[in-house]
Amino acid sequence: GLIDVRCYASRECWEPCRKVTGSGQAKCQNNQCRCY
């Protein structure tokens, strides 16, 4: 789901999502990170 991390590129979300979900799968959606 969405996490409270601002972004411009999906790769900016990989590390934050890995910390939250343990998965590096992420996308930047509407300038906010979404983890899968």
From Swiss-Prot:
Organism domain of life: Eukaryota
Keyword Translocase recorded: no
GO MF annotation list: ion channel inhibitor activity; potassium channel regulator activity; toxin activity
Pfam families in UniProt: Toxin_2 (PF00451)
Gene3D superfamilies in the cross-refs: Knottin, scorpion toxin-like
Family the entry assigns: Belongs to the short scorpion toxin superfamily. Potassium channel inhibitor family. Alpha-KTx 16 subfamily.
Protein name: Potassium channel toxin alpha-KTx 16.9
Organism, as annotated: Buthus paris (Scorpion)
